[in-house]
Amino acid sequence: MGNFILHPIQSRLIVISYSILILILPLYALFSYASNASWSLILEKATDPIAVAAYTLTIKMALYTAIINTIFGFIIAWVLTRYNFSGKRIMDAIVDLPLALPTSVAGLALSTVFGRNGLFGHILDFYNYEIIYTKRGILLAMIFVSFPFSVRAIQPILKEINKEEEEAAWSLGSGPLETFKRFIFPIILPAILNGFTLTFSRSLSEFGSIVMVAGNLPLQDLVSSVLISQYLEQYDYIGACVISIIVLMLACSVLLFVQIIHSLVVVDSK
């Protein structure tokens, strides 16, 4: 069987066509449908107090999640890369578990553990501390579903670090902290930013687990994805499209900001 080689023009055509079909066309349809409404209606839907509260809560929880998972993701990646211990392979496999679980199953699992009658819920209830059906439940759900991204972004870079160069830094009198600060951290910083971006994006789009662990009450713990679902259930397609576009624009703004920082970091490291 001969080698299957595509002409460069054919390759570009396939890539462009696939991108248009999967990415551009759905977004165009979203903007096109929203454009059928009057500007006054779009403004009314976009600035509705319930919608504004949902944007704010969603962005805030996604940022908190990205910060938390980036910190702990680095720690876990460091342990999995630098240490050998029994059960290491099992722990490494467990990291990817949230990617395999349906989000509704994740929500049910979290409710079973942290609900009022759950494994830890009754202990938390004794201290009048609730997680499920509160904003804490949203944060917990986002942390769970986006947990693997920072670990998997940082782990390969840590594996590629030249141990001989690291040992050379130690031999020159640099302590472990100084070696990490001057040698290791600049190398892994782009990966940390990538992990942060992936975690933030995944958290922003979460729906299945949040709808099960949050109270989904307007102006309290209602996130944008659930609000969009509620609009669709009410056959308010214009409202759903407007909210979707606003969330998309907010997400793109944050991601653009992170990418600018990433570019500056890469330039400085060269």
Swiss-Prot record:
Q: Where are the transmembrane segments?
A: 13-33, 61-81, 94-114, 138-158, 180-200, 208-228, 238-258
Q: What are the coiled-coil residue ranges? A: none
Keyword Ubl conjugation among record annotations: no
Query: Which GO terms label this protein's molecular function in UniProt?
Result: ABC-type sulfate transporter activity
Keyword Lyase carried by entry: no
Bilayer topology term: Multi-pass membrane protein
Location relative to the cell: Plastid membrane
Query: In its UniProt entry, what is this protein called?
Result: Probable sulfate transport system permease protein cysT
Q: Which gene encodes it?
A: cysT
